[in-house]
Swiss-Prot record:
Gene name for this UniProt entry: MMACHC
Essential cofactor(s): FAD; FMN
Role noted for this protein: Cobalamin (vitamin B12) cytosolic chaperone that catalyzes the reductive decyanation of cyanocob(III)alamin (cyanocobalamin, CNCbl) to yield cob(II)alamin and cyanide, using FAD or FMN as cofactors and NADPH as cosubstrate. Cyanocobalamin constitutes the inactive form of vitamin B12 introduced from the diet, and is converted into the active cofactors methylcobalamin (MeCbl) involved in methionine biosynthesis, and 5'-deoxyadenosylcobalamin (AdoCbl) involved in the TCA cycle.
Clinical disorder: Methylmalonic aciduria and homocystinuria, cblC type: An autosomal recessive disorder of cobalamin metabolism characterized by decreased levels of the coenzymes adenosylcobalamin (AdoCbl) and methylcobalamin (MeCbl). Affected individuals may have developmental, hematologic, neurologic, metabolic, ophthalmologic, and dermatologic clinical findings. Although considered a disease of infancy or childhood, some individuals develop symptoms in adulthood.
Protein name according to UniProt: Cyanocobalamin reductase / alkylcobalamin dealkylase
Region ranges (Disordered): 234-282
Free-text remark on how the cofactor is bound: Can utilize both FAD and FMN.
One Pfam family hit: MMACHC
Gene Ontology MF term list: cobalamin binding; cyanocobalamin reductase (cyanide-eliminating) (NADP+) activity; demethylase activity; FAD binding; glutathione binding; oxidoreductase activity; protein homodimerization activity; transferase activity, transferring alkyl or aryl (other than methyl) groups
Family in the record: Belongs to the MMACHC family.
Tissue expression remark: Widely expressed. Expressed at higher level in fetal liver. Also expressed in spleen, lymph node, thymus and bone marrow. Weakly or not expressed in peripheral blood leukocytes.
Keywords for this protein: Cobalamin, Cobalt, Cytoplasm, Disease variant, FAD, Flavoprotein, FMN, NADP, Oxidoreductase, Phosphoprotein, Transferase
Length: 282
């Protein structure tokens, strides 16, 4: 890895990793090469970017402390706002650089995703993006089958949170990092994609590989509980009906509301985030 990339990666990791995140560098060109122009990131190909994902540890290290600090405010989406807060700290830690941050949920006015998170994770070498095209002579006929990323250490027990772009920093010699193919057999890939598309509520697709760490039972219960009841589950008081202003020492942003992706997208590289019905948790 180039010294410049290693230095920036270390600084970003110092900001995010203590809170349960991982970061992976990639070139914008690697991402753009897989997609039609409408989905390209509008930066020179050698531009340095970092993919950010959350591990199971993020729940205890980042989300719960964030909720405890903000639980008397009306949060529209606590997980996304927690992630936005921590990604904002990356910008603060590198004030000398121009930084653009795209969260996984962001969309253009026409609802086109600003980043195709699973494609970015694949090209960054963070997680293998398993798709229908990875199954020879697949058994699904005319059914729509969405793809899913699997992490070599966490299986499906992680979430892609966004990308950090560094316009003006170009790394043409950065070597590509291939994602680890941790579900190599046809039978296991079929089981993974069927579990993700048809049985996602039971969490089992996330165990496509034996994970080093899973979501805790508390974390699973949190994401399986209706949003209005989640704070009570953690022993926190419910906020008042009117949003209170954020404190000056804990800034956070309000993400755009989420809407489902366009189910008519034909090319599998265009699948946004995690696409089956509203999943019980990230």
């Amino acid at each position: 890895m180039e010294p410049k990339v290693a230095e920036l990666k270390q600084k970003i990791e110092d900001t995010l990793c203590p809170f349960g995140f991982e970061v992976y560098p990639f070139q914008v060109a690697w991402y753009n090469e897989l997609l039609p122009p409408a989905f390209h990131l509008p930066l020179p190909g050698p531009t340095l970017a970092f993919l950010v994902l959350s591990t199971p540890a993020m729940f205890d290290r980042a989300l719960k402390p964030f909720l405890q600090s903000c639980h008397l405010r009306m949060l529209t989406d606590p997980v996304d706002q927690c992630v936005a807060y921590h990604l904002g700290r990356v910008r603060e830690s590198l004030p000398e650089l121009q930084i653009e941050i795209i969260a996984d949920y962001e969309v253009h006015p026409n609802r086109r995703p600003k980043i195709l998170a699973q494609t970015a994770a694949h090209v960054a070498g963070a997680a293998y993006y398993y798709q229908r095209q990875d199954v020879e002579a697949d058994p699904w006929g005319n059914q729509r089958i969405s793809g899913v990323c699997i992490h070599p250490r966490f299986g499906g027990w992680f979430a892609i949170r966004g990308v950090v772009l560094l316009p003006g920093i170009e790394v043409p010699d950065l070597p590509p990092r291939k994602p680890h193919d941790c579900v190599p057999t046809r039978a296991d890939r079929i089981a993974l994609l069927e579990g993700f598309n048809f049985h996602w509520r039971d969490w089992t697709y996330r165990d496509a590989v034996t994970p080093q760490e899973r979501y805790s039972e508390e974390q699973k219960a949190y994401f399986s509980t209706p949003p209005a009841q989640r704070l009570a589950l953690l022993g926190l008081a419910q906020p008042s009906e009117k949003p209170s202003s954020p404190s000056p020492d804990l800034p956070f942003t309000t993400p755009a509301p989420k809407k489902p992706g366009n189910p008519s997208r034909a090319r599998s590289w265009l699948s946004p985030r995690v696409s089956p019905p509203a999943s019980p948790g990230p």
